[in-house]
């Protein structure tokens, strides 16, 4: 997977341009089970999560890793129904397995959504994205 260097001020400007649009937040369900097998299995689960999100995203969307196994997809979309279709593209793969050392391991993701606020303060929004993920687990 290619890495792209991003200046955080550029990311902040991108977020400000997308004010009011939806952000989809994702997290691996039960990453601990993968890590209990091995850290490599956990890393593979995170990589697969990123690939699933990236495949659903269009070129004008931004995917950000916001934590160990937590990602945000900045959709730039304002229509809730369109956002739900996008989320379903990612979630439709829940339960599909990944292969690790000859073992099939089912991978599923949690997800929540949040809008980019009018008065964007990155630190607060970052906290809100994490809260969105936490709430999706309930």
Predicted features along the sequence, with ranges:
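Conserved long alpha-helical elements within nucleotide-processing catalytic cores of c-di-GMP signaling
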Residues: 2-22, 29-54, 64-68, 80-84, ...
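Catalytic-core segments of nucleotide cyclases and related cyclic-nucleotide turnover enzymes
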Residues: 13, 84-91, 101, 108, ...
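Short hydrophobic alpha-helical segments used for membrane anchoring or interfacial signaling
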Residues: 25-27, 113
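Catalytic core regions of nucleotide second-messenger enzymes
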Residues: 64-66, 94-110
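Residue-level recognition of strand-loop junctions within catalytic nucleotide-signaling folds
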Residues: 74-78, 95, 116-117
């Amino acid at each position: 997977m290619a890495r792209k260097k991003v200046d955080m001020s550029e990311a902040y400007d991108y977020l400000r341009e997308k004010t009011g649009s939806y952000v989809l937040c994702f997290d691996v369900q039960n990453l601990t089970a993968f890590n209990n097998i091995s850290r490599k299995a956990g890393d593979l689960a995170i990589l697969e999560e990123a690939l699933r999100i990236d495949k659903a995203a269009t070129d004008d969307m931004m995917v950000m890793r916001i934590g160990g196994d937590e990602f945000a997809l900045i959709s730039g979309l304002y229509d809730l129904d369109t956002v739900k279709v996008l989320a379903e593209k990612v979630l439709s793969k829940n339960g599909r397995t990944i292969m690790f050392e000859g073992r099939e391991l089912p991978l599923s993701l949690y997800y929540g959504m949040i809008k980019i606020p009018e008065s964007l303060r990155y630190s607060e929004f970052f906290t809100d994205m994490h809260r969105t993920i936490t709430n999706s687990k309930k």
